[in-house]
Amino acid sequence: MLKNIDPLLSPELLSTLRAMGHGDELAIVDANYPAASSGRQVIRADGSQVTAVAAAVLSLMPLDDFVPCAAFHMQVVDSAGGQLPIFDEFRALLRKYEPKLAKLEGIERFAFYERVKKCFAVVATGERRLYGNLILKKGIVRPD
């Protein structure tokens, strides 16, 4: 155990966050997502909600402010502009941890799958809400 670090951040996830560099992406996905077949390192967070894991990650990892958008969700199938309550929760987390970077962009389902294949790692949660999938692009920590 460590002080001031969310216990949802397992040793494996902490090591992954530390190893990631500027511009690397991390996918945090729901229980229905085919994480094991993504071809990426899969970190299990069974029993955890995607929003709780995202909050823990965002408490330590800066988002990329060199790009127009650093956070992405999977669009609702057959409804490119469809909004779900979980998307509002993602936005609230972005506003809390990265107020200047609170933009959240939807990506078509199959394009999302392809993007996840390029992510540094995938965190597979126990989230049961549909479309509980999020990609975060790592930024930089500026010197004090």
Segments predicted by a language model, with ranges:
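Catalytic cores of large soluble enzymes that bind and process phosphate-bearing ligands
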Residues: 1, 5, 45-49, 78-82, ...
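Long, hydrophobic N-terminal alpha-helical segment
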Residues: 1-46
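Generic secondary-structure signature for well-ordered alpha-helical cores
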Residues: 6, 10, 14, 18-22, ...
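Conserved mixed alpha/beta catalytic, RNA-binding, or beta-rich assembly cores of soluble enzyme
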Residues: 24, 30-32, 40-56, 60, ...
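Structural motif
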Residues: 24-27, 41-42, 64-74, 101-103, ...
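Glycine-rich nucleotide/cofactor/substrate-binding loop typically near the N-terminus or early
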Residues: 45, 54-93
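Glycine-rich, aromatic-bearing surface loops/beta-hairpins
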Residues: 78-144
